Amino acid sequence: MAIFVGSLQIRIDMPQFTHLHVHTQYSILDGAASIPSLMKRAKEFGMTAVAITDHGNMFGVKEFYDAANAAGLKPILGCEVYVVKNHREKDKDEKAGDHLILLAKNLKGYHNLVKLVSYSWTEGFYYKPRIDKELLRQYHEGLICSSACLGGELPQAIMHDDLEEASRIVEEFKEIFGEDYYLELQLHRSLSGAPDTDTCRHQVEVNKVLHDLAARHGVKLIVTNDVHFTLEEDAPAHDHLICLNTGRDLDDPNRMRYTGQEFFKSPDEMAALFPDDLEALENTMEIADKVEHYTLEHKPLMPDFPLPDDFVIDQAELRRIFLRRFDGQISGLEKKMADADEAKKPSLLHEMEGLRTEKAQAETADDLDAFAAGNERL
């Protein structure tokens, strides 16, 4: 990037940057960025790493992991989780939860992230999958955390002018995550000079306080763009997607709206938005460097059925089990035959004859294991 001082042109090396807050099409409500398009864009921008942080799920993680590795990019696997006071309580005042970004730093962190997201669905689901800070304390190892968007607990405290609570929140997360906790700056301002949206004005005010909190509490800042679609020209399609998924009309004044700036911006575009926060831009690479290379590949996980050392398969009992399976299927067909119209009876009769033939073979088969392996009905 070049700037002019009088007639003198000066070349400035832009800081390196990577996106750490990215929603793919697997963010079911509002994600419109396909994984292949994100990889293509990241390569075009010369990035070396990119993150996935879908809303409350990890459905796209394996596809993202494979695509990033194929593209020569480091996959940073994460999730934007919803945090409530008690994930087991169904409190309508907390049904949405506060947003929080979690990124897996290593394989241990990935496993802990899987546990957190699993618990959010199996124990904490109430309108949305939710966790709480008790779970975060239990499964924080190997995770990097950032304060998220305006929907995060910290930005919400700032927007409500509760700076004492904001300081308490920073200290709480710092106690849990230590140097792996970051404060997240966002600014959805158009570079073309379009008027600021309400969202952008809120972000400006929140960012001012985040700078103060970062200095006061010794926490580093990062810059993100809360990516929801890949290209700037995808904004109208993303807007239509929101309407479809929320059942609202485009002209509904009270519907969910985005700014149109939530696209996968280049490092230069992000630097232009944050000219005074070059260190926060560089800190995204600090996080990328923290993330270790690890594999998701493993052997098939088979259930373990412990058997006593003296266990012997009783061939006679095995044969009885096979025959009971055939008897059950034949009985079911006989009931269908009784209620079927005449047009269907020939096909049912043909199937029943086949089952009786196979039952007769099972009664006389020498190798029941081989017989069962070759029989799709068993």
Language-model features: where?
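Phosphodiester-processing cores and adjacent nucleic acid-binding clamps
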Residues: 3-378
